């Protein structure tokens, strides 16, 4: 555990210690801990380079040569050799980052309407994510946030058209850049349009944020898969499933549903 500095700044006494079978500094948190701001900055040595954390800890001595810790989220695991080819590696890395971002947005969108309706009393008519779309065929149609004074979503073609145009513009800017802004970057375009707060201005912070993004993106993709399975098995939203489980864990859990679930029944 990182030790707290007694003053606003201090220096770390560095010594080699075993960390998951690898030689690491005694404190993996860089000692830039300020008492006033209580800010901890992770050492990027923990996530990048040959001495980074591996997926099996001390049993990860033999990792593929092409997984050298250059990119965020590289724990040395590719048993199927899917990324042995450099072009395939670049493609898979881009797919993972983009799908992770979509999954983070999707997971929030699946939960947030249920939260707003239950505790903020916002009337969505149907807050459950996989049932909401069907409301477009109801008598009252479907309105954004359940408010008829906002954009009316009754026309599926109009919504689809706007979605294609808006997403096409954003993706085009992301890949090709903007006039006068630069050539762009497929995964991390940055700049005033994609990073207006300047969160990635510092290279060390930027490298750390990439790791946080890919880790949370992977977790969100698993979460979305869980939401899909819950929807098929229970017919309920994620928040309702969680509350049911907390209310009666014995009667509401995966094992109970696994014993009585029959696909298509």
Swiss-Prot record:
As given in the record, the signal peptide range reads none
Highest taxon, organism lineage = Eukaryota
List of residues binding chlorophyll a 3: 135, 145, 213
Question: Which residues does the annotation say bind chlorophyll b 4?
Answer: 163, 174
What does the note accompanying the cofactor annotation read?
Binds at least 14 chlorophylls (8 Chl-a and 6 Chl-b) and carotenoids such as lutein and neoxanthin.
Transit peptide (first-last residue): 1-42
Single annotated GO MF: metal ion binding
Indicate which residues the UniProt annotation says bind chlorophyll b 3: 155, 171
Looking up InterPro entries in the UniProt record yields: Chloro_AB-bd_pln, Chloroa_b-bind
Q: Which UniProt keywords apply?
A: Chlorophyll, Chloroplast, Chromophore, Magnesium, Membrane, Metal-binding, Phosphoprotein, Photosynthesis, Photosystem I, Photosystem II, Plastid, Thylakoid, Transit peptide, Transmembrane, Transmembrane helix
Biological process per Gene Ontology, one example term: photosynthesis, light harvesting in photosystem I
By its UniProt entry, which Gene3D superfamilies does this protein fall under?
A: Chlorophyll a/b binding protein domain
Q: Which residues bind chlorophyll b 5?
A: 163, 261
Question: Where is this protein localized, as stated in its record?
Answer: Plastid, Chloroplast thylakoid membrane
Binding sites annotated in the UniProt record for chlorophyll a 6: 245, 254
Q: Where does chlorophyll a 1 bind?
A: 77, 83, 96, 218
Query: How is it modified post-translationally?
Result: Photoregulated by reversible phosphorylation of its threonine residues.
Q: Which PANTHER family match?
A: CHLOROPHYLL A/B BINDING PROTEIN
Q: Which family does it belong to?
A: Belongs to the light-harvesting chlorophyll a/b-binding (LHC) protein family.
Assembly: The LHC complex consists of chlorophyll a-b binding proteins.
Please give the name of this protein.
Chlorophyll a-b binding protein 13, chloroplastic
């Amino acid at each position: 555990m990182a030790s707290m500095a007694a003053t606003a700044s201090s220096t770390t006494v560095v010594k080699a210690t075993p960390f998951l079978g690898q030689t690491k500094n005694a404190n993996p948190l860089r000692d830039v801990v300020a008492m006033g701001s209580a800010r901890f900055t992770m050492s990027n040595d923990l996530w990048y380079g040959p001495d980074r954390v591996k997926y099996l800890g001390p049993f990860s001595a033999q990792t593929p040569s092409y997984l050298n810790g250059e990119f965020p989220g590289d724990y040395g695991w590719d048993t199927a050799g899917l990324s042995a080819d450099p072009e395939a590696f670049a493609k898979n890395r881009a797919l993972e980052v983009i799908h992770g971002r979509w999954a983070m947005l999707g997971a929030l969108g699946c939960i947030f309407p249920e939260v707003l309706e239950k505790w903020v009393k916002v009337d969505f008519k149907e807050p459950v994510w996989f049932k909401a779309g069907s409301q477009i065929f109801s008598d009252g149609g479907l309105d954004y946030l359940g408010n008829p004074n906002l954009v009316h979503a009754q026309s599926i073609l109009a919504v689809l058209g706007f979605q294609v145009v808006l997403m096409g513009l954003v993706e085009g800017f992301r890949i090709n850049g903007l006039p006068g802004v630069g050539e762009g970057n497929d995964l991390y375009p940055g700049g005033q349009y994609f990073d207006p707060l300047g969160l990635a201005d510092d290279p060390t912070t930027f490298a750390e944020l990439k790791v946080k993004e890919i880790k949370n993106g992977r977790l969100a993709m698993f979460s979305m898969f869980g939401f899909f399975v819950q929807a098929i098995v229970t017919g309920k939203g994620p928040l309702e499933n969680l509350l049911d489980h907390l209310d009666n864990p014995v009667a509401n859990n995966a094992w109970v549903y696994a014993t009585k679930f029959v696909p298509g029944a």
